[in-house]
Amino acid sequence: MYYPEPITKLIDSFSKLPGIGPKTAARLAFFVLNMKEDDVLNFANALVSAKRELSHCSVCGHITDQDPCAICTDTSRDGSLICVVQDPKDVIAMEKMKEFHGKYHVLHGAISPMDGIGPEDINVPDLINRLKDEEVEELILATNPNIEGEATAMYISRLVKPSGIRTTRIAHGLPVGGDLEYADEVTLSKALEGRRDV
């Protein structure tokens, strides 16, 4: 289909976003064209500002507009407890829960030999250096419950074991309100493994 070049460029730009196909990209492009010019400028400025002003915390790797980030500099948090996550979005999910009061370490990915991603390609070396420099008592591995996340957690736990730091894995299992009959075998197995006393 023919579009004027500015629209084609806009559609191509939206198509680069995850989960956005050509039809959705075209819909978004035409939506933007119908917005007020001030709103479009604010939107464009917000994109540019986020890209320019945000970086990764030099301590934990989380996205921040200050370095070190607000979590790393918060003295009320328990520095002896570090939760290892794959992505900054995982930190946000944990923070919404308002139950974890330790600190974080963001890996920015997971080990995936099939994709050519090894431990050196994610933030594992910085984690190991951090464990040497800080007085950490427990490392909570909160990587995703998929093959890559499990491989990453296993690798880190084996790497950390000689240090004597307690290493735990978050439990995986059934969602609240879920029915057993709809759960797959792996989910049920993980739920059973993660059981606790009541």
Curated annotation (Swiss-Prot):
InterPro entries the UniProt entry points to: DNA_Rcmb_RecR (IPR000093), Rcmb_RecR (IPR023627), Rcmb_RecR_Znf (IPR015967), TOPRIM_dom (IPR006171), TOPRIM_RecR (IPR034137)
Biological process terms in GO annotation: DNA recombination; DNA repair
Family in the record: Belongs to the RecR family.
Database matches in SUPFAM superfamilies: Recombination protein RecR (SSF111304)
Keyword terms, alphabetized: DNA damage, DNA recombination, DNA repair, Metal-binding, Zinc, Zinc-finger
A matching Pfam family: Toprim_4
Annotated function: May play a role in DNA repair. It seems to be involved in an RecBC-independent recombinational process of DNA repair. It may act with RecF and RecO.
Statement: the UniProt record of this protein carries the keyword Cell division: no
MF terms (GO), sorted A to Z: DNA binding; zinc ion binding
Toprim domain ranges (all copies): 80-175
Name by which UniProt lists this protein: Recombination protein RecR
NCBIfam families on file: recR
Zinc finger residue ranges, C4-type: 57-72
This protein's record includes keyword DNA damage: yes
